[in-house]
Amino acid sequence: NVNYLVSDYLAEITMSIMARARARDEKLGYATDFIQDLIVPNLSEINRKGIKIISNAGGVNPLACAEIVENLIAEAGLNLKVATILGDDLITQIEELSDQNYEEMYSNERFPEKDNILSVNAYLGAFPIASALQDGSDIIITGRSVDSAVTLGACIYEFGWSPEDVDQLAGGSLAGHILECGTQATGGNFTDWQDSIDNLVDIGYPVAEV
């Protein structure tokens, strides 16, 4: 039985692509394939089996993404609770951030000119996801969360971990990173793959036990 279905859609380049989409249309800026490929074809099954959905598909516009999901739920006559986790979008603080003269930690490159910035985002963690689950949410959509947070948030809620349970949180984080890497964790990043398998078409996905 599936209890949680989690998905990670974001990378730094993805955020810039989504920011450009939002600049063209204020209703865009999220992962549209989350709607088309996950929600639309599976909504009735998600409802029937009580599967919790956790995703950072909100990108730079999680409210717009959540609105689409809520409309689909209403059209289907279902009673599912959607939660949106915000706080990563710092674009309104661009003036303040520019004035701080921040430097990139490795290259010492100065903070970019504000006119050249499409989006500014902080990484959200897993505890807000756990709180949303505690509140009874069925579908949780975040902006730029840590890649592993979609898995770790479910673990925190399921096992009742606290911020002091650092060993357990480390294990949940590791599981989350392995799972979100998908086939990269099962040989997709292996330089000499041709010496061990015939091709990369069907190399399988990782399994993590917490």
Predicted features and spans:
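Structured core elements
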Residues: 6, 140, 207-209
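Catalytic or ion-translocation cores adjacent to nucleophile or general acid/base/metal-coordination motifs
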Residues: 30, 74-90, 94, 151-198
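Surface-exposed loop and adjacent secondary-structure segments within mature catalytic domains
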Residues: 98-106
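Charge-patterned, long linear interaction tracts outside catalytic cores
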Residues: 130-164
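Short, glycine-/Ser/Thr-/acidic-enriched flexible segments
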Residues: 10-12, 146-147, 185
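Long, contiguous hydrophobic alpha-helical segments, chiefly transmembrane helices and signal peptides
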Residues: 53-54, 58, 140-141, 145, ...
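Polyanion-binding loop/helix "lid" in catalytic or ligand-binding cores
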Residues: 37-47, 116-133, 168-210
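Metallocofactor- and cofactor-centric catalytic cores in central/energy metabolism, strongly enriched
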Residues: 1-97, 109-123, 128, 134, ...
